[in-house]
Curated annotation (Swiss-Prot):
InterPro entries: Amidohydro-rel, DHOdimr, Dihydroorotase_CS, Metal_Hydrolase. It catalyses: (S)-dihydroorotate + H2O = N-carbamoyl-L-aspartate + H(+). The modification N6-carboxylysine is found at residue 103. This is Dihydroorotase. Its cofactor is Zn(2+). Belongs to the metallo-dependent hydrolases superfamily. DHOase family. Class II DHOase subfamily. The keyword Zinc applies. Zn(2+) 1 binds at residues 17, 19, 103, 251.
Length: 348
């Protein structure tokens, strides 16, 4: 990577965790991802979750239809794991190059996860098949028991679900997605080569004070929820260390304005427009720009066993204003950092 004071040139990055939704929302948000990233792991939690090969093929085509001319972008599809999922269907999708990975949502952990897994034991035959195939398991790592505090869900998940699972299936490739705690950072750091993590820009930039002090900021509300500053600092230190099993996953998750700014608002930050520049700012603040390219462009392909992208992206130190909103057909989207200025932007 070359890193003059005003320009960062890196291999074209990938986004290893994104929500593109469907319908008009999909058409609005896809270009923000396809313009910058060569590939993206697309989450399967639509209102009707992606649980079959045919559904994934159809969804992939809807995504490709929304990619503007001139964008070179490959959506990597995932299968939504349910208690009743057929392991043969999953294997067929993997062998046919339709499914890149499978996603484990604990039931009711986040948006459109009511169809999720009630217990790991319920899907053990599927997970055993994935281990044999070398197919990555993507995990939303939170328990959802009513008696567990929302700020403790991730740490409890490590002890009660993640570690027992990895002890049982020792060569299953696992991505601990959007980690938010020092517990998870340490767990991944201490893990072996079969365990990796994605980290979002919001969890590197903010903590729960930013969301709650001086008024509630609904556009910082996401799941897993922002944690204390000690957890934010642990994530920042992990990426700044050059740790190679952590990589870019924005978890960009758009919801229309009226679904965010309401008495019972939805979880998710639509960060696709400013995510790459946000990551760059964090790495710069941590004096870790030497590790920026690996986090964005190299570590993910290495874990997934995929080639690195051939193109390049340049970020320039050119302050840009993030728009207050982005138009939808019948509403608007409020992007991450709306109305603020970002100091690194992607050169067009």
């Amino acid at each position: 990577m070359t890193a003059p004071s005003q320009v960062l040139k890196i291999r074209r990055p990938d986004d290893w965790h994104v929500h593109l939704r469907d319908g008009d929302m999909l058409k609005t948000v896809v270009p923000y991802t396809s313009e910058i990233y060569g590939r993206a792991i697309v989450m399967p939690n639509l209102a009707s979750p992606i649980t079959t090969v045919d559904a994934a093929i159809a969804y992939r085509q809807r995504i490709l239809d929304a990619v503007p001319a001139g964008h070179d972008f490959t959506p990597l599809m995932t299968c939504y794991l349910t208690d009743s999922l057929d392991a043969d269907e999953l294997e067929r999708g993997f062998h046919e190059g339709v499914f890149t990975a499978a996603k484990l949502y604990p039931a009711n952990a986040t948006t459109n996860s009511s169809h999720g897994v009630t217990s790991v034991d319920a899907i053990m035959p599927v997970l055993e098949r994935m281990e044999k195939l070398g197919m990555p398991l993507l995990v939303h790592g939170e328990v959802t028991h009513a008696d567990v505090d929302i700020f403790d869900r991730e740490a409890r998940f490590i002890d009660t679900v993640m570690e027992p699972l990895r002890q049982r299936l020792t060569t299953l490739k696992v991505v601990f997605e959007h980690i938010t705690t020092k517990d998870a950072a340490q767990y991944v750091r201490d893990g072996n080569d079969y365990l990796a993590a994605t980290i979002t820009p919001q969890h590197l930039m903010f903590n729960r004070n930013d969301m709650l002090v001086g008024g509630i900021r609904p556009h910082l509300y996401c799941l897993p929820i922002l944690k204390r500053n000690i957890h934010q600092q642990a994530l920042r230190e992990l990426v700044a260390s050059g740790f190679t099993r952590a990589f870019l996953g924005t978890d960009s998750a758009p919801h229309s304005r009226h679904r965010k700014e309401t008495s019972c608002g939805c979880a998710g930050c639509f960060n696709a427009p400013s995510a790459l520049g946000s990551y760059a700012a964090v790495f710069e603040e941590m004096n870790a720009l030497a590790h920026f390219e690996a986090f964005c462009s190299l570590n993910g392909p290495q874990f997934y066993g995929l080639p690195v992208n051939t193109g390049w992206v340049e970020l320039v130190r050119d302050e840009q204003h993030v728009p207050e909103n982005i138009a939808l057909a019948d509403d608007s989207l409020v992007p991450f950092l709306a109305g603020e200025t970002v100091r690194w932007s992607v050169k067009k």
